[in-house]
Amino acid sequence: MMITKKLYQCMCLLCMVIALLDVVSSDDAKEQKMKDKIISLPGQPPNLNFSQFSGYVTVDPAAGRALFYWLTEAPRPSGTKPLVLWLNGGPGCSSIAYGASEEVGPFRVNPDGKTLRLNLYAWNKVANVLFLDSPAGVGFSYTNTSSDELTVGDKRTGEDAYRFLVRWLERFPEYKERAFYIAGESYAGHYIPELAQLIVNRNKGAKNPTINLKGILMGNPLVDDYNDNKGMRDYWWNHGLISDESYNDLTKWCLNDSILFPKLNCNAALNQALSEFGDIDPYNINSPACTTHASSNEWMQAWRYRGNDECVVGYTRKYMNDPNVHKSFHARLNGSTPWTPCSRVIRKNWKDSPKSMLPIIKNLLQAHLRIWIFSGDSDAVLPLSGTRHSINAMKLKSSKRWYPWYHSHGLVGGWSQVYEDGLLTYTTVRAAGHEVPLSQPRLALFLFTHFLANHSLPSSPS
């Protein structure tokens, strides 16, 4: 009896300690959240009607890996709006540099590199948007273990992003169980399905999962090496960008090769094909050519980087290297190392990169996750033809055949097809490049709003 009583007392004491630790942990999270609140960014417009937070979440204490985030909440009250995580690709490119500063974020950097203007088509008008620099070593994210940047790949990036979400939600508990989506572009065609798969697997058996994943949205994504190589070749030849000889060489050497690390013969075929493009921007073949790179060789290497167009981030680069901006963002940066939009070290040393995301995408559909994929039809980097080949390879059931969709001005915004009783939607965006929200911001917001509402894009003018 005495032993039972003592055991009971010990159990009660243990419960009290655990409860106390939970309270302390909760208080620490609240305190850190308030420290993360952005009072004002340098040069930001006055009288904003939304809140911003930014800072770090440690994902591996032993290695000292910490990921940087920037949360731009929806206009107040934001409590009913979903949470959307935005990821850029590369691999090795910053979501703060591209997604936040050039595409779907609330601000654009002015030509002076010092002041900001409002983005009229910011996605935080309809959702709370969370931008993440991933993996560690990209943008403002960092690691205290230098070898991390030489050994990272898809697997660790996904695991770290999952840990980030779990720990970030402790800091922002109001977003627990909130409708959650993952969006992004380019190599995020790997990041997004892989992270979604982790969430789905770890949510199994949970009645009210903390990460309430509802769907994913991918723009001009890399999802399958074979089909993307095939689609790239087709797009280049069909648009008159390359010769018959280059078409044949790409067919011979590149179809079964790696997108990230092509072998010698494929590399030679790609370089020859690129030399035939002339003075155009492959990220948007109908836009003025990029003049950032000093030589054609540098231009081709930058394009082959297959991350994001560095030509569009000149103003952002200047802004993000301002120490006052770092202070306002609560960002840590080595004073001797300038902020860069992409990490060439990470890109060059990327380790694991599965050849195809199609099996994962099919698994996500079987888990009844909603998937939208969109393509800017002027992108020659990861063109629409590759994505269409990939979707066809999955042999999905068509629910609504190919049709033109119309935006709010009654004009054709692109073309779309719906599969698997509405679970997967594919759509193109007219006159848009690799970064659709950059070249067609109005259409991108229109598409995003329909995605969140689970409404098909309109098939007739309104």
Curated annotation (Swiss-Prot):
Expressed in seedlings, roots and senescent leaves. Pfam families: Peptidase_S10. This is Serine carboxypeptidase-like 28. One of its GO terms (molecular function) is serine-type carboxypeptidase activity. The active site is at S186, D379, H434. The gene is SCPL28. Its main location: secreted. Glycans are attached at N49, N144, N256, N334, N454. Belongs to the peptidase S10 family. Residues 1-26 form the signal peptide. It comes from the Eukaryota. One of its GO terms (biological process) is proteolysis. It is found in: Secreted. Probable carboxypeptidase. Keywords: Carboxypeptidase, Disulfide bond, Glycoprotein, Hydrolase, Protease, Secreted, Signal. InterPro entries: AB_hydrolase_fold (IPR029058), Peptidase_S10 (IPR001563), Ser_caboxypep_ser_AS (IPR018202). One of its GO terms (cellular component) is extracellular region.
